[in-house]
């Protein structure tokens, strides 16, 4: 059995892996950027549903869930800051494919991205996501993470978010080993070398990965 350092070294130097060649992943990524069905339009604050300013001029949701935008003052500067006290989860699944370490990456399309899709963790969820406060479905692979034994967790650590944008926000950062599982739409098993190679594309890798 390889040590962790040996697994990392092999994965970092593997560009054409047993699952995908790097060129196949690049082609997939480029096609996502050309997705004409994913369109984003800026709207005025007054056009948002169920959001409003409270008596203290914080921007909040009627349900008091999700997050709020509060005012902070520091160094004679007054800014808006995101207040989201619930702990989020940033999780990455790993597996061995023909002896090479792979991580399950989501090519995630989000409205605020400079590019349409970014390489992101397997799970990137707030409490509102995994408690289905928005009325939608659970994040992909959420139940898989819950079923993984604790001794399969390589990393399980509480870490802070960006303090310039979030007020005392924390995420549970998890890396867990699993048997090979099939990819859902928008997910790819990638070697660490393949992920690193994507840095040649500007704005391609989500900061949470």
Task: Name these PLM-found stretches.
Residues 1-75, 208-209:
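N-terminal domain-onset segments
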Residues 65-131:
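Aromatic- and glycine-enriched beta-alpha-beta binding-site module
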Residues 50-51, 86-88, 156-158:
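Short amphipathic alpha-helical surface micro-motifs
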